[in-house]
Structures are given as structure tokens and as C-alpha cells.
Amino acid sequence: MKKISIITPCYNEKDALYECVKRINDLFQKELNTYKYEHIICDNNSDSETVNILRNIAAKNPNVKVILNAKNYGSVKSTFNGIKNSTGDAVLLFYPVDMQDPPEKIPELVKNWQKGFDFVVGCRSQREEFFLMKQTRKFFYFILKNFSKNEIPMNVSDFQLVDRKIVNQMVKLKDNFPFIRTLAFEYSDNYTTVEYTWKKREIGNSKEFFKDYISSAINGLISVSDAPFRFILMIGILVSIFSISYGLFSLFYNIFFQNDLDKGMPTLLISVLIFSGLQLLVLGFLGEYTSSMHNQIKKQIEVNEKEKINF
């Protein structure tokens, strides 16, 4: 009987935990009853109430395994550590405790994996969220798809079922900040996609803030490609050509048609502001790449596990 591993990061999620675990257990009692499973919950130093709930769940269900981290390492590092601790023939890399990625899609992921695909990717074709956030994500996915060195589908998510042979390659990666949703694409092109609606959160509140989304997006772009450098270079070349052309035009226009150069001050100020902004943008990207290289050169920081339950 084949085994499926499911990884769930957790931080102060006492309101959603019981339902999250129940949904998975029900699936393997019914639709997926020909498979064994382990549900690895990676807790990022939550409050005592959340930890007590985790202990209670694990005591009643041996399929639920809990890793209690000594501190909050964030969802990415704790999830990757959970993947390292998994033993299944296939691993669901990320199953959120808020169930916005619907557990009802897991049987479809498993069915496609059994057809021989190395991994099956969940794609969020629809999103139940406000307009501005939806458009921001669309722009990010457009950049990710078009600048990545691998062929990555639009709206790719971490909700992926990955075969053990690919997982074994992934966990060898020495990366302090792995971008999990694109890792499998580094090792195989043999995949298929499953589309679904990313649902509005119904239980509890999100522990992720806007800065966390920005950090994840920057990390993702840096991880998958050096194209931002080339993109900035192209912008720089185009802006330089435009500014030189406009400068020559302004010079000749003022020489031959008017004598009052003060009238050009607004244009000068706008130009200075635009180019200053571009310089800061370039420096920002350089800083991000330099910081990324610095973090990779440093010895990898492992997750300090305070306690493991049911392992």
C-alpha cells in the first residue's frame, strides 16, 4: 500500500486545526482508502493552547505527526523541514491549515500522479480575494512565468504532489530560503496541472502580512532567474537613449527658438526624479541579489526542533 505525506505549517491556528486534520482523515477513510498517509504538522512555536490541541490530535490519530519548532522559522523553512522528515511515496508539499487550497482536490492530484507524472501542480485559476490583491498576484505570476529559466505554468502554487524520487533530489538543496513552488521544475518536465479556485479563508485569521508576501515574491524571482538584471539593463538602455535624445532636442530647441532656459526647469526636475528613481530601483535589485548570495554562502541554518511527536 503506497503512502502519501502531507505537510502543513502552523502558527497559532487553534481555530482551524481540528477541521484541517479532519478533512484529511476523512479523505483517506473514503476516497483514498487504498493509501496510507502521514500528516506532518510543522508548528512554529505557537501559543500553549495551539500546542495542546496538536498534542491531543496526535494522541488520538497516529497518522498525524507533529514537529514543534524552538522558534518561529516562518512557513517556508518549517515546510521544507517537514518535507525532509517525510517518508511517503509522494509528498503534498503544502497543505494550508486554513484550507484555502481545497483538500477535495487531493484525490485528483493522487490520480494524476498514479498515471506516471513525476509531480502534479495545483494552479489557482480563480481567487476569492479583493481586486487589487488579485491583480498584483497576476502581475507576479506573469513575471515568474516569462522570466524563469524553467517552463512554469501560470498561477502555480505550493499545493503540489511530488514523487519521492524528485523529493529526494529537492531535499539535497542547500538553500536558506527555498522557493518551494518552483523547486520540482528544476528536476523534471514530466508534470501535469490541476486547476482550482483558491477560496476565501473561513476559519481564523491569516498570520501572513503584506511584507511577507513581498519578501516571498522577491525571493521567488531571485531564485528562479537572473532575468531581472537583464530586464533592468534593457530599461536602462532605453531610458538612456530617450534621455540623450530628449537632451539634444531640448538643447537645440532652446538655442534656436528661445533664450529663456528657466522654462525648462520643470522638465529638468522631472528627469532628475525619474533617473534617481531608476537608480534606486537598480541598487535595490543589486542589494537583493547580493543579500541572497551572502545568505547562500553562509552555513545553512537548520530548523531547531524542540520536540517530535508520533515519529
Give names to the regions the model predicted.
Residues 34, 43-51, 99-100:
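A conserved acidic beta->alpha catalytic loop
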Residues 182, 186-311:
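Hydrophobic helical membrane-anchoring modules
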Residues 89-100:
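Short beta-strand-to-loop acidic/aromatic patch adjacent to the donor-nucleotide binding site
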Residues 13-30:
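Short, well-formed alpha-helical segments that are part of the catalytic scaffolds
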Residues 13-16, 46, 102:
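Donor nucleotide-sugar binding loop of glycosyltransferases
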Residues 69-71, 75-85, 103-178, 199-218:
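Acceptor/aglycone-binding surface of glycosyltransferases and processive sugar-polymer synthases
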Residues 40, 51-80, 84-85:
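Conserved donor nucleotide-binding strand/loop of the catalytic core
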Residues 3-5, 38:
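Cell-envelope/extracellular polymer assembly enzymes that use nucleotide-activated donors
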